[in-house]
Amino acid sequence: MKIALFGGSFDPPHNGHNSVVLEALEKLDIDKLIIMPTYINPFKQSFSADEKQRFLWVKKLWGHLPKVEICDFETKQKRPVPSIESVKYLYKLYNPSKFYLLIGADHLEKLHLWHDFEKLNSLVEFVIANRNDIEIPKNFKDLKTDKKIASSFIRNTLNTNEVCEEIKDEVKKYYEKLQKN
């Protein structure tokens, strides 16, 4: 079995994430795409939307797609989970012949700082979701995406133009409520 893991904060999920999901399904030779929202990113202090809400949004957006599985492994841990831990968990579950790890190009600069990076690098093939035509190292796969949007922009401005249509209204209401509190 060939699998790909796309983990992320999804705070909120948006058209950029959707572009990565659709491109991965189309361009990668995989049997399963596992989308795994984080409880909290090991490099961040907090999130705006709680893990349950982000998981529900992700499930609503992509849970119905063929070959897609939404996995709650990290959200159930109630702590920051390094990617290597999630990868090892999925190896035990699926014993894949090929394992792709999808990350945004914005993570390339600090990738060497990830927990147990050398081991992680030996277990997966990195696929870089490249939205800014950044030069990708030769040993990584380049997955071109056409959306240049950041979740922080949506949270800060409440501009939901780039939020996936299926959750646009609830995302706007959710972040408006957070800003009022």
UniProtKB/Swiss-Prot annotation:
Catalytic activity: nicotinate beta-D-ribonucleotide + ATP + H(+) = deamido-NAD(+) + diphosphate
UniProt GO molecular function: ATP binding; nicotinate-nucleotide adenylyltransferase activity
GO biological process, alphabetically ordered: NAD biosynthetic process
Biological or metabolic pathway of the protein: Cofactor biosynthesis; NAD(+) biosynthesis; deamido-NAD(+) from nicotinate D-ribonucleotide: step 1/1
Gene coding for it: nadD
NCBIfam families: cyt_tran_rel, nicotinate (nicotinamide) nucleotide adenylyltransferase
Native species: Campylobacter jejuni subsp. jejuni serotype O:6 (strain 81116 / NCTC 11828)
Matches recorded under InterPro entries: Cyt_trans-like, NadD/NMNAT, Rossmann-like_a/b/a_fold
Nucleus keyword on record: no
Task performed by this protein: Catalyzes the reversible adenylation of nicotinate mononucleotide (NaMN) to nicotinic acid adenine dinucleotide (NaAD).
Family per similarity comment: Belongs to the NadD family.
This protein's name: Probable nicotinate-nucleotide adenylyltransferase
EC number: 2.7.7.18
Keyword entries, A-Z: ATP-binding, NAD, Nucleotide-binding, Nucleotidyltransferase, Pyridine nucleotide biosynthesis, Transferase
Transmembrane recorded as keyword: no
